[in-house]
Amino acid sequence: MEFSWGSGQESRRLLLLLLLLSAWEAGNGQLHYSVSEEAKHGTFVGRIAQDLGLELAELVPRLFRVASKGRGGLLEVNLQNGILFVNSRIDREELCRRSAECSIHLEVIVDRPLQVFHVDVEVRDINDNPPVFPATQKNLSIAESRPLDSRFPLEGASDADIGENALLTYRLSPNEYFSLEKPSDDELVKGLGLILRKSLDREEAPEIFLVLTATDGGKPELTGTVQLLITVLDANDNAPAFDRTIYKVRLLENVPNGTLVIKLNASDLDEGLNGDIIYSFSNDISPNVKSKFHIDPITGQIIVKGYIDFEESKSYEIIVEGIDKGQLPLSGHCRVIVEVEDNNDNVPDLEFKSLSLPIREDAPLGTVIALISVSDKDMGVNGLVTCSLTSHVPFKLVSTFKNYYSLVLDSALDRESVSAYELVVTARDGGSPSLWATASVSVEVADVNDNAPAFAQPEYTVFVKENNPPGCHIFTVSAWDADAQENALVSYSLVERRVGERALSSYVSVHAESGKVYALQPLDHEELELLQFQVTARDAGVPPLGSNVTLQVFVLDENDNAPALLAHRAGGTGGAVSELVPWSVGVDHVVAKVRAVDADSGYNAWLSYELQPGTGGARIPFRVGLYTGEISTTRALDETDAPRHRLLVLVKDHGEPALTATATVLVSLVESGQAPKASSRALVGAVGPDAALVDVNVYLIIAICAVSSLLVLTLLLYTALRCSAPPTEGACAPGKPTLVCSSAVGSWSYSQQRRPRVCSGEGPPKTDLMAFSPSLPDSRDREDELQTTEESFAKPRQPNPDWRYSASLRAGMHSSVHLEEAGILRAGPGGPDQQWPTVSSATPEPEAGEVSPPVGAGVNSNSWTFKYGPGNPKQSGPGELPDKFIIPGSPAIISIRQEPANSQIDKSDFITFGKKEETKKKKKKKKGNKTQEKKEKGNSTTDNSDQ
């Protein structure tokens, strides 16, 4: 054969066409090989690994394997060189019977990732089977009266091969009576017969021996023979004849037994017994046909007597002969072709080829989970199978190859929502009614650490009494993780920071597994009121996830500090205070004031004063204010009173149990002409206006100098602390001593170790500077007042009832407070907040300075809030100082008191916020009212209480 190439352009087109065909087959995922049947073991078939595009080194790691349907082991792959070879004997006739096409279908499966390739190996036929006749000898009885050209059917030979190897040619041994009629193209293979060419003469030749030879088309040719023994009969001249020589019938599979297939009819021109016909199956039909069908010998009806299955056989060929009853019976023949029609009687078959389980919850979309193979033995629409999946699941089925589906991930997974899926795959054919089959698979979702531990709330408030034993359990934190196994194993730890000069871990610890929080040392309310820190919960996943929770531990106060006496300004030996009192003083004259502080808070720091009875039961003309500590006279003094008195004042707090301290005051009675101590509260004798003015100026200068000095000192100290403080958040340190505020109606005692003691992790505490200016007339007004003896009082201004102390001012207040209504403790996210109502009355108490105690024990005075209700405090006269003013930047209130001669000064408290309106109002007073106001001042000796 010669090939003549045209132009170069045609060559390129042909080459491009071949490349496109190769690429199409490669993309289709199929390979085609061919091998001859009966090939020896080890015969080379093809380089399958190379043709699939796989490297030899990855065959074993990717679990390269070959699977075939039905018959395994015929072909195998050498994993060392990737060659497909013959492993065992291949017999095409056994494998495919007489099918025109015979292939071995292989499935090549590799993992990581999962891939499936289809390989078809065509089995080529070789001429290894000779033609075979049903019998080696056939006997024929032919009447001598048969006319010429009579036809006598013969059973042809069969060849197990196909194609040209099964293409048979027949030849008859030479004779003068018969010739061989070969089948034409439009007839079936078995249309072979003898044609009578010369009349028979029984007397001349009673028997005729012929040999029929069948030769196939293979190379080399193979032959088969059958001996024909023809017996010449005498008499009956007419044989039965059927209406048609070939009948074709369609029959549904699965029809019940007794179903009529066809009714045959044959006729015989003879009469009598020679014309009676008996129907029967030819002896040449297979036993399988005889087991499926039955023919009635009289009527010629063929009925079903066995199970007809389309999948077993698609058609049946039945040879029927009609024989008359003549002495020399004659026969006629016909063929019945029964074509079986398919019925949808087979359910689809499902099989999971490969599973990749469990699947991670973070698997990307499109991940292949399983490979599903479906098949149906029916044909046509009845064998067309479609698959469906359970609805409302994050998976879908994707058709990959013919009768193959891939189960892939369609949407994101969340193990915390659904940890496993029960999937049901339904395969349904296209028949009517449709048949279906199901297969289920459980898909477990593997956990991924995608959930951090979560606390029930972002922060907790814990209350712990001070002086707790070391190692006591104060709280338990608990976090929950929605993940599983190690990803849900939660451990707890502290977020380390510094509290003052010490590490947080020296105060508290947390158990890593249980989350229990322990106090490692006794807590001191006076040192640390609030300890704020964070606890971290972290799981054991990779990478680990964590979250924090804030704990606010409030240290509750206990009465563990006794009242402490403050040194008197005049001093006294042995802790005793000495006072000189004129004999001429009247009732309620203030002799001295006992000052005490308590480091505790609330009721534990609320102090009361009691005067111990004198020795021998003698009555003494003095009393002490229950809450003010002021010692005053109960009556006018006379000669019966002792000139010296030793007073014992018991200072007691309101804790449980109460703690006490005792102060000693030595009172000496002197004549009016003797000068009393400067510390005395009362001035004896009448002092003129000039002397009073001098005293006022002296006290004013002292106060201004003290305030200025304290302000400068506070600013310097604050600057030094800010510069030297370590850059730690939430540091706490003991504060500096504070001052004491006192008046005739009560005493406010402040801890000597106080600073804002609330520790948190949000930054250093803020410093609130609040300036309270005393309501004093300016220098110009004072000069005008020195030139006149008339004084005027301005109208009293009421403080703002909504005013509150600042945070730094409240943090330093730890003493008894002049209040009469109950306080309310409210616990919020930032800690307890106590509000104390105001004093509702400014009437002097029956006993100097006594007030009703606040309701509720254990209240933290650091969070007291003072309200000043409506009242009528008296305005300070000219040259007088207000009772109190507050040093900026300090929680202390300074008491400055000036008493005119023979009278008791008014006790009015003034708190202003930088406003200097009092002096302006004094200028606007009319001079006509000065005389009347002076008279009212002289007659008024009543003290007003703080509002």
UniProtKB/Swiss-Prot annotation:
- Pfam families the UniProt entry points to: Cadherin (PF00028), Cadherin_2 (PF08266), Cadherin_tail (PF15974)
List all topological domains (Extracellular): 30-697
Q: Which loops or segments lie on the Cytoplasmic side of the membrane, by the record?
A: 719-947
- Entries under SUPFAM superfamilies matching the protein: Cadherin-like (SSF49313)
| Signal peptide annotation | 1-29
Q: Where is the composition biased (Basic and acidic residues)?
A: 906-920
Q: Which CDD domains match?
A: Cadherin_repeat
**What kind of membrane protein is this, topologically?**
Single-pass type I membrane protein
In residue terms, where are the PXXP repeats? 734-737, 774-777, 796-799, 829-832, 870-873, 888-891
Know anything about its domains from the record? Cadherin 1 to cadherin 4 domains mediate homophilic trans-interaction, the interaction with an identical protocadherin expressed by a neighboring cell. This is a head-to-tail interaction, the cadherin 1 domain interacting with the cadherin 4 domain and the cadherin 2 domain interacting the cadherin 3 domain of the other protocadherin. The cadherin 6 domain mediates promiscuous interactions with protocadherins on the same cell membrane. Each cadherin domain binds three calcium ions.
Which protein is depicted?
Protocadherin alpha-4
Species this chain originates from? Pan troglodytes
